[in-house]
Amino acid sequence: MNLNSHIAAFFDFDETLLEVESGKLGIQWLWDRRLVPFGYILKILVANFFYQRRLLSDERMVKIMLTFYKKKRLTDFQKGAENFYKAYLKPRLAPGILARVHFHKNEGHLLVLISGSVRYLLEPVVRDLEFDHLLCTDLEV
């Protein structure tokens, strides 16, 4: 029996494996493709102002951010997830943390990615870095 298969390494995504918040990059990606209305951007900026001052809870901030997906088809976003990963996320992976991911993979440990971000944005990361499990936000459609 391989004892290493019973060891798991857990990695947080935002501001750990990824040097920045993925939500900001996601909004930038949507904005660059003209897929997000200006009103939504304004709403996020105002909410973020209050969130940064701890006047808005994590839960409320997430609810505000997720309003973007209301009445939209998830498949439209899933189609661009791989390109988003390659262009926006992969270049911002933290080298030191990435080295730890590779170390644990080489040791035969299970790799678990944890994030509050949505699944479709994280699946390309999981595939590319060969994570074994993903714990994240699933959108209800």
Language model segments and positions:
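Residue-level signature of catalytic and energy-coupling elements of molecular machines
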Residues: E15, F77, S115
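Hydrophobic packing residues within well-ordered alpha-helices of enzyme cores
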Residues: G26, I97, L122-V126
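Substrate-recognition/cap helix-loop segment adjacent to the acidic, metal-dependent catalytic center
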Residues: N106, L110, S117-V141
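Active-site neighborhood of HAD-like aspartate-dependent phosphohydrolases
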Residues: M1-R53
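Metal-dependent phosphoesterase signature
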Residues: R60-G96
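Conserved alpha/beta cores of soluble small-molecule-handling proteins
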Residues: L35-V36, Q52-L56, L74-D76, P95, ...
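Short, acidic loop-to-helix structural element flanking the phosphoryl-transfer center
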Residues: E82-R119
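Short, compositionally biased "basic patch" segments
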Residues: A47-R53, V62-L74, H133-L134, D138
